């Protein structure tokens, strides 16, 4: 299958390209050379590649940064999605598309609501999540008005080797490794009272490929582990593995204006459609992040 991946130079995009090629797909990745906010640029890429499958990953994804630039998040995440789907309808109307949304669209939930299912209401609590809700609306319009085969994926938190330090796990790992370098006895962290559902990025990209094959157009699928874990627990595991003597000190300036206390999803619908289930443990994922960041810092 010829597959196009937008946002291919990003953390997930790189893993997805590797997985698709390992499965025998003819996978072509585009990133900054295809400006998804420019309809002509998107059309040119689609006309050149003529994909049978499109994985639309290109997006702004840092939740914290979305508060300072919500307009740009809307431009990239919503207009970008519209341009990809409009272009596909013109050039490759039968192509199957996976739109990568986010579990952040669910917003603040109660513990008794967990694990979240796809029919649960959406109530975005930050500009990033709002942009993803709007992108989902664009996808539903494409399905309803043009009959495009667009499947919406809502991944919960994911992690793995190569993730940016804009995200919590690699950020903590980086600070712990820096503390070892500096001989420091403490690092600053943000709010560790929250609980999140983490999947390994390799499990996540495997789900994307399965959804291209077996997902139903217009349907939404959670990608989740089904288990919520406290960020404090994760930070302690990382501290024990890297620098047990280092204390964790909360810095109020690192706390987001609105924080979702707990998030956890059900992957039952995804399993029914594709037989997907998570295969990589959290401890394996954390170990991979540590090893990769040590290599990146020349500390292997």
Indicate where each model-derived feature is located.
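NAD(P)H-binding glycine-rich loop region in Rossmannoid oxidoreductase-like domains
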Residues: 40-76
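Conserved C-terminal active-site "lid" loop/helix of NAD(P)H-dependent oxidoreductases
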Residues: 201, 220, 233, 252-284, ...
